[in-house]
Amino acid sequence: PFDDLRTTCITSLVTTLCEAHETRTLLRLDLLEWQPHIERTLSFQARHASPLAHPSYFHILYAYHVSRGDYKSAAASMYQHAHRLGVLTRDAPSLESMQAYAVQQAQSFLVCINALVLLPATLAWFAHDNTDSLAATGRPTDRHALRGRVTHYVPQPAGPASLAIVQLADVRREYHELLTRLQLMQTYPELAHGATPWRAVDALPLFVANDDYDAAWSTAEQLQLPMDSFFDALTLKCVLLERAFHKRAAHYEHEDEALKSLYMGDEEEADPNAAFLRRSARTASWPGHAHERAWKYLRVHLEATEHGVQYRRIIAERLI
């Protein structure tokens, strides 16, 4: 009976300190033999509360693990929080709320990454339960964090638990995929709707269609996407710009050199195929005509990739 009473008191103490936003006091408590129960209490509260609840038990659990030097568990708690927020993101009623949830989700992924990088490379992983009740239902809970005892029976799904090993590279990929979607939402607001199909591989053609080749390149590198469409579209831009240059040069062949340079410069500036050069911070300081800068842009990126032979074949096929 005394053990049950002690357990109840410890549980009440933990929840009371959390509700009073006294996390520092909780972390300073010298309750060595009760640390496992404190961790179970915080984990239970985090699992059964809304990811937007205050106090945020996921953040408290993260601080608890960090204070004990357990960066693996700290990362796992924030990864779970990010996925809970992902459910809210899919069901967000408006673009503004979706962006707000997605920003919080990205922050949780980033905190998870920061915890994992503190570990040796061989230990930068954790196990994640794919049968998480909230993720399985696809609906956020309306309940606030539970108070009181946590020793009541909690039904578990039938069958063995489905565990996934999550590595640092996996979290980084999810983080960059989310940032990419947030960036694309500025141009394509329909991506904010949960019913809109979204795959990371779709980001590259969307950036290319928007003449944002810098973003397309960085996204392809971060997410390790094939760049076939990038080099194919870029080669076509180069060809069209060079053809337009020679056509303009022939048109103004008999004009005064000063006027010819002025006319051709104005038309190059207005050429829609040169829009990607105007958007790129890299090409802003490059001298030369638009087609010369475009070919240089292609060459620089071709030399920067590890699959130059494959992409040279794509460029050659476009030029034939």
Where on the chain are the PLM-derived regions?
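Extended alpha-helical assembly domains of large eukaryotic scaffold proteins
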Residues: 1-320
